[in-house]
């Protein structure tokens, strides 16, 4: 298993043009959010944090075209802010970030599974350098290529995405590094939304999130929250599966 650290600071490069959200905060804005979240036990619904605190956190979330990070996409095609009483039956997914001003929508349910069980030819471009891999937002293209591939090459992570809400006639895909890293960049807002609505899954530090991006034909990239709030990316050997199971998050093809 390999690792590539791209940044050593507590937040990612504030000038990044590929991911938005927490990483685009000024230091003053970041300090404000950090003060709000530093004492929260995200996995303990009975801790002292109040709903007002989570609402205050969400006020700092990035907004594009009247849609905010951590808003929910409803079955009727509208977006709504996190609020109590929101039913899972009415929700398609949650906004985890933006790319080219289009919202990246993630499923409420997370799955486990790795990209591959064996060595194979790559589905898309190979990224040997992590800094380049973080610029990849082609998960939709790669997933479509996989879907049209050979039946004997069925892999866990792709299948979880292709089969999610299959009866709804929606197109879900396995995210590339840029898309998955964008989601992890915004974990504070997503967790705050979860604590208000009780929908979805808490994003924890140390959890491994698989991507469809490959380092080469033998290794795939995954994302993990380490060192405070920023995600780093790592690679695992697909043949030996030393990593074990990764978390898979289906993302939705959605264009405004």
What are these regions (language model features)?
Residues 2-168, 244-256:
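Short, compositionally biased
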Residues 2, 154-171, 177-244, 253-256:
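An exposed tryptophan-centered "aromatic clamp" motif
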Residues 105, 173-174:
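Short, conserved beta-strand segments within well-ordered enzyme catalytic domains
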């Amino acid at each position: 298993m390999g690792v590539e650290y791209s940044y050593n600071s507590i937040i990612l490069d504030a000038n990044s043009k590929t991911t938005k959200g927490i990483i685009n905060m000024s230091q003053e804005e970041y300090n404000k959010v950090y003060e709000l979240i530093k004492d929260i036990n995200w996995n303990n619904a009975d801790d002292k944090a109040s709903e007002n605190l989570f609402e205050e956190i969400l006020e700092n979330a990035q907004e594009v075209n009247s849609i905010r990070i951590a808003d929910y996409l409803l079955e009727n095609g509208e977006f709504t802010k996190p609020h109590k009483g929101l039913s899972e039956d009415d929700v398609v997914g949650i906004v985890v970030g933006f790319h080219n001003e289009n919202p990246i929508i993630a499923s409420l349910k997370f799955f486990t599974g790795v990209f591959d069980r064996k060595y194979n030819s790559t589905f898309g471009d190979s990224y040997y350098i992590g800094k380049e891999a973080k610029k990849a937002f082609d998960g939709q293209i790669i997933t479509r290529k996989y879907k049209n591939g050979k039946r004997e090459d069925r892999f866990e992570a792709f299948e979880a995405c292709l089969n999610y809400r299959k009866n709804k006639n929606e197109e879900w895909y396995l995210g590339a590094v840029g898309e998955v890293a964008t989601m992890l960049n915004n974990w504070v807002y997503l967790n705050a939304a979860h604590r208000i609505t009780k929908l979805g899954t808490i994003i924890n530090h140390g959890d491994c999130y698989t991507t469809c991006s490959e380092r080469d034909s033998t290794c795939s990239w995954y994302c993990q929250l380490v060192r405070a709030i920023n995600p780093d990316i790592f690679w695992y050997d697909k043949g030996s599966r030393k990593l074990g199971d990764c978390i898979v998050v289906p993302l939705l093809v959605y264009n405004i």
